[in-house]
Amino acid sequence: MPTIQQLIRNKRQAAENKTKSPALQRSPQRRGVCTRVYTTTPKKPNSALRKVARVRLTSGFEVTAYIPGIGHNLQEHSVVLVRGGRVKDLPGVRYHIVRGTLDVVGVKDRRKGRSKYGVKRPK
């Protein structure tokens, strides 16, 4: 417990909030180029082949980003938009790729939750 004299000399330091997505550098999204597109397995107790991509961002960072939805058209050198948001069962994956922008197409035949997967309203 500091004395009043110590508090006059040095005021209390406010704890700084640490960002969960540092590679975005306080931007809502960042553009990047896929350097590798692959699948990986989630940690226990889940089992699947999750689609992820290694992306080199315009901020200079190279991050691993999750590709949401069923099916995708991504390959090496695809230009993508990356947003924050981790995948709980994939360690080290702290970003999501935005579907329906730049080189990524929206999810085919998606009817519900379309806005999250870049799908236009069906006729």
From Swiss-Prot:
The keyword Transport does not apply. Gene3D superfamilies: Nucleic acid-binding proteins. GO terms for molecular function: rRNA binding; structural constituent of ribosome. Residues 9-31 are annotated as: Disordered. The keyword Ribonucleoprotein applies. Keywords: Chloroplast, Plastid, Ribonucleoprotein, Ribosomal protein, RNA-binding, rRNA-binding. It comes from the Eukaryota. GO terms for biological process: translation. It is found in: Plastid, Chloroplast. Its main location: plastid. GO terms for cellular component: chloroplast; small ribosomal subunit. It holds the Pfam family Ribosom_S12_S23. With S4 and S5 plays an important role in translational accuracy. Located at the interface of the 30S and 50S subunits. Part of the 30S ribosomal subunit. Belongs to the universal ribosomal protein uS12 family. NCBIfam families: rpsL_bact (TIGR00981). This is Small ribosomal subunit protein uS12c. It comes from Spirogyra maxima.
